[in-house]
Design a protein with these regions (language model features):
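Active-site-adjacent "lid/gating" segments in soluble enzymes
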Residues: 1-124, 128, 136
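Aromatic-enriched alpha-helical interface/lid elements that frame and gate functional surfaces
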Residues: 112-190
Length: 192
């Protein structure tokens, strides 16, 4: 187990998950929402260690399985950096389908999968991946049942252009009720 892998310019470099897993893999920059006074996201220290340790455990088990089947041993390795890149593969895949770079300002994020501040100062976030199935119910719950019929928002491309407006509408709705009430409402709609 190394910070950056057994080969390459950083092969002998030391590292902790804050830098090797989070920062160099792109999380701290890509996960920040840019504002005039923003900075790279602060990461949960040790979380990258846990993921990397789990990956190392899986490689050891795979090598043991291979030995039990073939009689041959194997060399296993992983690194904090490689685990960070592997963990970011979902973001990388999504970014490939987006014009330009990944969302960095709040108005570029998906309103249906963003955190919102509630009346009690707590945050609520849902994650809608099946848009046609769940978004209309969310829109109704937020008080915007006709949102998808609005000519500004009636196609995915138009919604992307006007995400900032949708974010403002949603923020006002979420701010009107406490988080636990929103959790009950969203759970009742089978929205994660």
């Amino acid at each position: 187990l190394t910070a950056y892998g057994p080969e390459g310019p950083d092969a002998d470099a030391p590292g902790f998950d804050a830098v090797a897993f989070w920062a160099k893999a792109g999380y701290t920059a890509d996960m920040s929402v840019k504002t005039d006074n923003s900075y790279p996201a602060l990461t949960p220290l040790g979380a990258g260690d846990t993921v990397t340790g789990t990956m190392l455990y899986a490689t050891i088990l795979t090598a043991l399985l291979r030995r039990s089947v073939t009689g041959e041993g194997d060399f296993v390795t992983t690194s904090l950096y490689n685990a960070g890149i592997w963990s970011a593969c979902g973001m990388i895949a999504v970014a490939r389908n987006m014009p330009g770079i990944a969302p960095v300002r709040r108005e570029e994020c998906s309103p249906e999968s963003s955190p919102f501040l509630c009346a009690d100062g707590e945050w609520v976030m849902c994650c809608i991946l099946e848009y046609d199935r769940y978004a209309p119910a969310l829109h109704r719950a937020l008080g915007y049942p006709d949102l998808l019929h609005d000519p500004r928002f009636d196609t995915p491309e138009k919604r992307m252009l006007h995400n900032g407006e949708i974010m403002d509408l949603f923020a006002a709705s979420f701010a009107a009720k406490p988080a636990d009430e929103w959790v009950r409402i969203l759970s009742g709609l089978d929205i994660v």
